[in-house]
């Protein structure tokens, strides 16, 4: 087995002033020993309890995310596991930290009219630390569920790094490179990737393994997602595709 993945990373050149060079690609190498796949907020698209609410908010974005999980993210995770890359799930939660007294809770209540403590309660947590209940959103199905050897980190804001154990886990694993997938691109995945860069992790996002929250009457379908992909390529890291990643995993594992 080869010990290194090689992927073409796309980025955007915002120079020279007044005449940007635009998109470019370069070969990026990822040692298996210091690379992990980061999976942000993917839940079971077919889990019965997930049909009442989706973190993707709009019907269009929810529909697109379900297709992406089934057709693109699952093969990516299967490929990563097959060559021994750590797979790290980052998921919403409701810790007992008086979130209702926070500006974050107020903003979510005003924009989505949801009680985060109730929305993200779980029935398999310590009720002394987390809000215990039967969440109607944090459910997995056979396609999306973490495997026994995967890692699982709970978060309670958009960023998977804020007040969590994620950075500790990555440093203990010796990770320097993150292959990122999940949702929503303009919220939790985006915030997590920004915080990863600030902590000196190199970020590669699989651009067909994510989607943004697109608003009816404001965003033509796909436009806000496309703009955010370009933003990632301008200011956060690089992008590639699920097919390229899966093919490279197959090559490395052969």
Regions found by a protein language model. Give the residues of each.
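Active-site-adjacent betaalpha module
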Residues: 1-36, 43-54, 63-66, 75, ...
